[in-house]
């Protein structure tokens, strides 16, 4: 006799954001499959007006809803420049990145719900675990943290808040750190911003040069890849802290290497000539800003696939939409 899989009801916070949108829609598709372990899926976006940085906001919602087996927190304030330089940005970063995860965790525990919390490589920097870094290693979940900007510091506080809230139920939460996340549901992702820069350069710059930093290193990760990591937590009942990033052949990837890989991949796509990328040249530069110069993490969860393959799959799947995006902004 075959037993049906137990269905998990899942709450997705931030379902209108770049990651949350893809997580929510992927789970909805899975919930329709008979052999899936995904049950009812509910998404909460900005339009719900739920103030997650207030202690009881989520708890009140959960008390008046169905029981959720899992809550996936995709909410974050990711504008690192505003978090560093603007008063309102600093407040929003602290509220959404530091306070909200703690209160979300407390609400989930009250309703006996497991939490999957998304965090960042920015909890690390070139100042983290100095000996380990000097030896050329990538960061592991147990590596020393040392954020160098407000965003990273707030995200680390959020991690601590989640872990402390679950201290009596350590198998009830998973923290997935990811890095340089890209997806289609955000025109401010690196890929979209880079392509905007390319279009502008083709129109206005006779040298057709696009400047890219070579003194930042991390690992580009697609929303599709991160979703596989999230599903792995649910399917295998994993708990603790994981680094949800693809593999790399070297110790991290620079923005310059990332941009070159985007160009090379798009040039190999069908109809690539339509978007005129062949004349673009990348100019290496070194910039100093409020970001870690090295925050590359080693993969500890998800498919053992390299970042270049993940990028190629993403760009091939979304080539038409990206070409349309470039055509639209070129007008």
Residue ranges of predicted features:
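N-terminal Rossmann NAD(P)H-binding glycine-rich loop of SDR-like oxidoreductase domains
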Residues: 2-30
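SDR active-site strand-loop-helix element
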Residues: 13, 44, 71-75, 115-121, ...
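NAD(P)H-binding glycine-rich loop region in Rossmannoid oxidoreductase-like domains
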Residues: 53-98, 109
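Conserved C-terminal active-site "lid" loop/helix of NAD(P)H-dependent oxidoreductases
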Residues: 252-260, 281-320, 324-330
